[in-house]
Amino acid sequence: MADIMDYIDWRGDIGFDEVHVNEVDGLIFSQLIYVQMKPYMPDAKKSYLTIKQLSSLYCADHSDDEIEQMPNLFRHSARLLQKLAHSRRYADCILRYYIYDISEKEESQFSAVTIELPDGTYFISYSGTDHDA
């Protein structure tokens, strides 16, 4: 069964100007939030990087062996970031306004990033605490 990595292999060479953003792109961007970006984007209002730039910085700090030892969700997200960085479709998307807020006192967490596509479209990816357990 195909997954999002297969989709990137299949459609990663097609720009957003040729095929507009779709539901699978949304799924891919939603997964990207699980990459820890704070060391590379410390100021939410001023920091921004392309996916390709973030991948280069992230991979300089995390060896393949280290990535392989990460929990499944984070390992998959790191591998996704690497694949996106090598695709025409995603490499130049700009990541902005990254927030990573954890409160042990309130037992909450929230992270979000705005992804700017080359055509000026914005996508907001976020994750947070679910108190409905």
Q: What are the functions of these language-model segments?
A:
Residues M1-A133:
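Non-catalytic, mobile gating and regulatory segments of ester bond hydrolases
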